[in-house]
Amino acid sequence: MAQLPEPSDQTIRILLVDDEVRLTELLRLELDVEGYDVEVASDGATGLIKARSQPEPDLIVLDWNLPDFSGVDICQRIRSSGVTTPILMLTGHDDIADRVKALDAGVDDYLVKPFSIEELMARLRAMQRRAQGFSGSGQGKDAGLTFLAVGGLTINTQ
């Protein structure tokens, strides 16, 4: 089984928004074993409420095909409300146009069903690392970084 990243003083909260009961039960079990705290929403409206609730989840796993809204619509609504929580779209939509649509809507990563649990866990860990690295929490590799220089461009990160 995969390991969580080392700096893990608190449990990572994942919101899983999917209406497939068997899949959510399997994912909840796997994520629990990995040490994540999982909350499930079986429709988009409930997922939207939980995504905006305090404290916000640390990561969101969002299905495209929900009974009331599309995952893309939910993602757009989450983003328009100012929530920056990393979102992974978990879907059967394997078309490039669908991937682009989801990424343009604000999804951070995209995983096509069927998928391997190992790949899902690796993607969640990567999203978690990116979120910690840019959150200013002091946990990221470059947490003390004041300036970022790329080519002729220099950015003050403070």
PLM segments and residue spans:
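Short, Lys/Arg-enriched segments at the junction into DNA-binding effector domains
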Residues: 10-15, 126-158
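Active-site residues of response regulator receiver
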Residues: 63, 91
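Conserved phosphotransfer cores of two-component systems
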Residues: 52-55, 77-84, 105
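The feature encodes the CheY-like receiver
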Residues: 24, 67, 95, 113
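Acidic, metal-coordinating helix/loop segments flanking the phosphotransfer/catalytic sites
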Residues: 40-59
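Charged docking surfaces used in two-component/phosphorelay signaling
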Residues: 25-33
